[in-house]
Amino acid sequence: MIIYTCLTNNYVSLPTHMPTGAEYYVFGVENPPAPWKSLPNPKHIEDPIRLSRYHKINCPFDESVYVDASRLHLLNDSFIGLCEAILRETDFFVMQHPHKHTYLEECAEYFSRGWVDEKTLIEFTEEIKESGFKFNKFFSPMCTILIRRNQWHLNDLWWDWYVKGGIRDQLSFSVALQLSKTKFDTDDARSFLNRFTDGEPDGVWWKNRTGDYKYCEGGDPSHLVDKLSKITGLNKTMRYRAARLKKTGQLILGDRSKYFTKNDPVLEIINGI
């Protein structure tokens, strides 16, 4: 079994004590420590974030497991056995994100965190609408682990949409998954992760560096959500669950049932049921 990752700017160190039963490859690191083997990145992509996504999306192996570099230190023998069992049963597996975002919520998060600007999100939404994307069927993925075999068509389509939709790859993944009609297996992320690590809200899986970059000013996504609701036909009451922590002002989007009670006094409800 091949396990691979992509690492640009050396934002984490490659762990050297990896479980047996797999070959380990890294894109973007020359002369990595054992057991890692180095593979080259393309030369035509200058942005380090986009570069790190290139081989994540355009998987060069017939059969492999992609793992985000920031989570490699959490892999163990149980993970190897789990991946082997999945590959015996299916050609493609991806986790469902615990927040279970709708399309509106996913876009709102990208803008609010300064990851993708409003113009890009609106143009992307209009283009996938013309391509026949069903917004009410949006699947909320967590792409830190991808277990796949011969998914060349999906990979190509994913990259095509990725370069149009901003620096994050979940939105374009969901679009490619639906439009390619790829058959896949999935599981709730926490349920899957708890089989080899701690995926609960305060678990070790979430204690890492991720998404600490900005490509636009960001801010309150309410105006953007109004525009996207009109384009997509998605009802805001049902498809935009938003709240804010009273103490910090942090925006909470999507399914928050694992973190807060229904009428939790620490929250200011912005929208949704």
Question: What spans do the regions from the language model cover?
Answer:
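A short beta-strand micro-motif
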Residues: R241-L245
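Basic/aromatic-rich interaction segments and small domains that mediate binding to polyanionic partners
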Residues: Q250-P265
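A conserved donor-nucleotide-binding helix/loop in the catalytic core
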Residues: K43-V67, D77-L82, S172-F173
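Catalytic core and acceptor-binding pocket of nucleotide-sugar-dependent glycosyltransferases
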Residues: W115-Y213
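Conserved donor-nucleotide/metal-binding helix-loop-beta segment in metal-dependent transferases, i.e.
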Residues: L75-E105
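N-terminal anchoring/stem segment of glycosyltransferases
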Residues: M1-S52, D62-E63, K164-I167
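Intrinsically disordered, low-complexity, charged/polar segments
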Residues: P265-G272
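The conserved acidic donor/metal-binding loop of glycosyltransferases
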Residues: D68-L72
